[in-house]
Amino acid sequence: MNIHEYQAKALLKSFGAPVADGVAIFSADEAEAAAKQLPGPLYVVKSQIHAGGRGKGKFKELSPDAKGGVRLAKSIEDVVANSKDMLGNTLVTKQTGPAGKQVNRLYIEDGADIDRELYLSILVDRSVGQVAFVVSTEGGMDIETVAHDTPEKIITVAIDPAAGVTAADSTAISDALKLEGAAREDGAKLFPILYKAFVEKDMALLEVNPLIVMTNGRLRVLDAKVSFDGNALFRHEDIRALRDKSEEDEKEIQAHEYDLAYVALDGNIGCMVNGAGLAMATMDIIKLYGAEPANFLDVGGGATKEKVTAAFKIITADPAVQGILVNIFGGIMKCDVIAEGVLAAVKEVGLKVPLVVRLEGTNVELGKKIINESGLNVISADDLDDAAQKIVKAVKG
C-alpha cells in the first residue's frame, strides 16, 4: 500500500526525522491560509499523487511549457496562483503512463536552502536476505538515470537484523554519502530513526529523494515515498486509515475484495491463471508471440465459482482487453469450477472478445465438457504454447 508524500513525512516526523513544516490542502481556497502558517518567504507547492517524477511531469490541460507538478513559490500570491493552476488537472509523469493522474491535493511546504542533494532508500535486499540502505551522492530527480548510467555511484549497506543500525553502519552510510561535520552527526541520528520506522511499520520501501544537506550544514528529509507490506496491514490500523483509494486502480480494488492477486498492465490480452508462477509464464509466452498481457491475475488454488466469476468480470471491465486467455492447471483448483465460473461471468457480462481456454488437471474432462456444451464461441487449446498462439492470432486477426 502506498501513501502520499505529506503522510509519509508526518509519519517519519513522528519518529524524530528532520522534516520541513508543511500543510496539505484539498482546494485552492485553502492555499493562502496554508502558506500563512509557514515561515516563508520561500514555499514549495507539491502535487500529491502516487507516482514519482512529479517535478518533470506535465499537466495535460496546460500548455507544454507550463511548470511541472512541483513548483517553487516566492510569495503567498504565487502559492495561491500555482494551487489554482494545479488542483483538478491531470499530471503525466514517467511513472503514471500517458493517462496521468488527477491532482486532488497539494502539499504546501516551507522552502529550504539546499547545498547538496542525496539519495537514500531502505528496502529488503533479497540477495542477502536483509534490510539494506541504498544510498548515492547523486540525489534528486534523475536517480533513475544514475542507476542506469553509473551504477557504481549507488552503494548498498546491509543491516544485521539482530543488531540494527550500528555505529559502523552509520559510518559506512555517511562515508558513502560523503557527509561531514554537522551533517555527519545528523546522519548518525537519522539512519537508526529511519530503520526503526521501516521495521516497526512493516514498510516494503522507504525512499528519501532527495535527502538534502542545507547551507547551514544540517540534514533534512526533502521528499519521502513510503510503501507498506499489504500482508502486514492487519496490525497497523493507523496506516490503513491513510489509504487513498482514488489513487488506486478500480479493478485492483475489486480484486482485493475477492482476495485475487491482480495487477493491471498496459497490454491487450487479459489473463486468468491459477498460481503466480504459471501466471508469469503465461504473460511471458504471450509476449514471446508478439502481444502484450493486459494484467497479471492469479485466482489462487482454492477459488470458488463466485471468485472465478468476479475475476472474469474484472478482466472484461478493462476497455483495453481485446482477447482473454484462461490457463488453468488444476491441482487443488478443479477445472469444472473454473469452467462454471467463466460461463457464469460470460452469461452476465457477455463475450465481446475472443476467449481461449486451456484446462489441465483435476476434473479436466468435466471442465471441457461444460465449456463444449455451453454453446459459446470458446477456443479450446491443448497446451500453453498452443493457447498463446491461438489468442494472439485471434486478437491480431
From Swiss-Prot:
Keywords: ATP-binding, Ligase, Magnesium, Metal-binding, Nucleotide-binding, Tricarboxylic acid cycle. ATP binds at residues 46, 53-55, 109, 112, 117. Pathway: Carbohydrate metabolism; tricarboxylic acid cycle; succinate from succinyl-CoA (ligase route): step 1/1. GO terms for molecular function: ATP binding; magnesium ion binding; succinate-CoA ligase (ADP-forming) activity; succinate-CoA ligase (GDP-forming) activity. Substrate binds at residues 274, 331-333. Binds 1 Mg(2+) ion per subunit. It catalyses: succinate + ATP + CoA = succinyl-CoA + ADP + phosphate; GTP + succinate + CoA = succinyl-CoA + GDP + phosphate. Its EC number is 6.2.1.5. Gene3D superfamilies: ATP-grasp fold, A domain, ATP-grasp fold, B domain, Succinyl-CoA synthetase domains. Its cofactor is Mg(2+). Heterotetramer of two alpha and two beta subunits. NCBIfam families: PRK00696.1 (NF001913), sucCoAbeta (TIGR01016). Succinyl-CoA synthetase functions in the citric acid cycle (TCA), coupling the hydrolysis of succinyl-CoA to the synthesis of either ATP or GTP and thus represents the only step of substrate-level phosphorylation in the TCA. The beta subunit provides nucleotide specificity of the enzyme and binds the substrate succinate, while the binding sites for coenzyme A and phosphate are found in the alpha subunit. This is Succinate--CoA ligase [ADP-forming] subunit beta.
